């Protein structure tokens, strides 16, 4: 692709197909296959408080095609903002990544000032194999703060049976009944998570239940009589299943409940012909979820690094 300086402008909804194509080109270069859908990008654009005209940018090459994309957001409202950037792997323009990063940092500082955060930070993920992005972030003052694993389970040979603890019943989510219970259970279960925030219920409901791949039979609640002990949210897309969140409330931890809920989800996905299941997990999580996922037959396929930078000053 051309090395001529690219024009950076605010993203529009009309850019969605090209943004998806760009991100999939990056996916292929990094992991060998496309891994981004329009729903994934639209989910970013639908985060609480996100304004597309101010919070996302595209870089347009001299052939009018998109060669870069970046965004910033503040969905957690904890003072830890997030951003990311992509460049087409065939596009050679040394300073484009820096220009895209600068847009995201500038907007993040504006958002932090508007919300009066005392010590705002900006977080950016980098897949372990992307050395150029890692070096870019390090040059601009970011430091490694966390490691996250992408894990995969192949269900072709069946689902590992992991029974629920005695007295616990795992049941599918009931639309119109369980929304508040699911929201509250997930919020409490993830209160120790390093990026935990209290997402307002209405925003949470619109984002997750409004997802194009929402299927209530892939969401589960674990019940101890009439009290929710844990929750799991999963989606299916094509032949792939994705576990978006699995949480167990503190009194019910260390009893195998997480694995049992995962097995229920695997069985539901396999029944729909989705034999490959993936999820992301914090490698340093206090609840040691990695062991739960390994017992359920999952293994690490990719490593992602989270880099952080103070926004003050």
Question: Language-model features: where?
Answer:
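Conserved active-site tyrosine of GNAT-family acetyltransferases
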Residues: 133, 137, 293, 298
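A conserved beta-strand-loop-helix scaffold within acyl/acetyltransferase catalytic domains
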Residues: 30-50, 70-78, 193-248
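C-terminal "cap" of GNAT-fold acetyltransferases
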Residues: 150-169, 275-287, 296-313
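Short amphipathic alpha-helix that is part of the acyltransferase structural core
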Residues: 1-44, 163-199
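Acyl-donor-binding surface of acyltransferase catalytic domains
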Residues: 73-167, 305-309
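Conserved acetyl-CoA-binding loop-helix of GNAT-fold acetyltransferases
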Residues: 93-110, 248, 254-271, 276, ...
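A short, internal acetyl-CoA/4′-phosphopantetheine-binding micro-motif in the GNAT/acyltransferase core
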Residues: 60, 73, 84-96, 246-254, ...
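Conserved hydrophobic beta-strand within the GNAT/NAT acetyltransferase core sheet
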Residues: 83, 122-124, 243, 277-281
